Amino acid sequence: MHVHFRDPGFTYKEDLETGSHAAAAGGFTTVVCMANTKPIVDTPEVIQDILKRAENLPIHVKQVSAVSKGFEGKELVDFQAMVDAGACGFTDDGIPLLNATFCYEAMQKAAALHMPISLHEEDKA
């Protein structure tokens, strides 16, 4: 289940605790949190913090990594380091990767690690 728990940074909307209890009440046992938090989930430290705080929640909380640093579509995150930190996939959720070469490189890196990459491609025009 794709979720936006908004933790860290936007916990006035939702957080790990309230989101996990709501998911459990709805019968969901596992959720995948998106990376559009503050800070963005684009470093191993951020992902490790989230997963550590999720350890004692009533459901399984998984975390995706951003594809690009800062969701800027210019520099890829360190895919291997993010997987090692616990990422279950990659996405710049809600922000299209407009450079085809950059997107292709991201897909190659994700495939080499046998990890999914989820794209939200659209022309904002």
Predicted features along the sequence, with ranges:
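Histidine/acidic-residue-rich, glycine-tolerant segments that coordinate divalent metal ions
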Residues: 37-49, 53-125
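Metal-associated gating/positioning segment near the N- to mid-region
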Residues: 1-54
